[in-house]
């Protein structure tokens, strides 16, 4: 069971964007960082375990020649083996900062080739894999950046082509050196999923076709792809074969966020229907089939939920953001 805990106030409410919450836990300092997008700015907050806000910072998109400031599409902390970077995507490009947002270490501008003349340019979908950071674009390409152990010498090393429509989300999992193991999945506006193996050159392993609805959020855990769709469904696929194992009518409206607690296999789903659900994933050791169990449901009354994340790898607490809601809601186990 979960209960509501002290919420964290925001200067501005969260924008109505999917995956509009990023969480970075710092156990050594007993702190949790939260990142939320609102229009042309991203709010970064630090909070103590009991939810007491300790610091706030606002980040803005690198200015260009435009009349109005460009909108931010996502903010996300990328945890690499040797450093943590904060990545911000927008209608103008990709910005990478040190983890506290104090120093921008890299800027990548989107070029006109990233979109047609009638389509807005933007980047969206952020994830870290080994020493790479992968970012999706509106053209369906995934940009792979090679990240050094320190300093600003970040290099665009590869562009992955597997999608024809804008990228919505990217998820990764550490493959722990296993050859041939899928460790990244990308999703797009048409619902297509691409499963990849990272490395000096990324390899497309499986392409899972869509079925006419977008896939706003995706996760990867122990060879299981969890995908949340615009019709409220959560589908679980085998990453190696692309086979559909489980289909859940989880929500009544578009799913806005999925998250995983990797140490226990808990899956969190949140949607515009005001509900947040927690599920337990498992792979049957005898049959190899994927199994799922519903663990908890939480109604965020009168709120269009746009972001939700676990706050620890055991899934014992989670946080939620909502459109026009000027606070981050927190829940913890009783």
Swiss-Prot record:
It holds the Pfam family WDR54. GO terms for biological process: fusion of sperm to egg plasma membrane involved in single fertilization; negative regulation of receptor internalization; regulation of epidermal growth factor receptor signaling pathway; regulation of MAPK cascade; single fertilization. The keyword Cell membrane applies. WD repeats lie at residues 116-155, 162-206, 250-289. SUPFAM superfamilies: WD40 repeat-like (SSF50978). It is found in: Vesicle; Cytoplasm; Cell membrane. This is WD repeat-containing protein 54. It comes from Mus musculus.
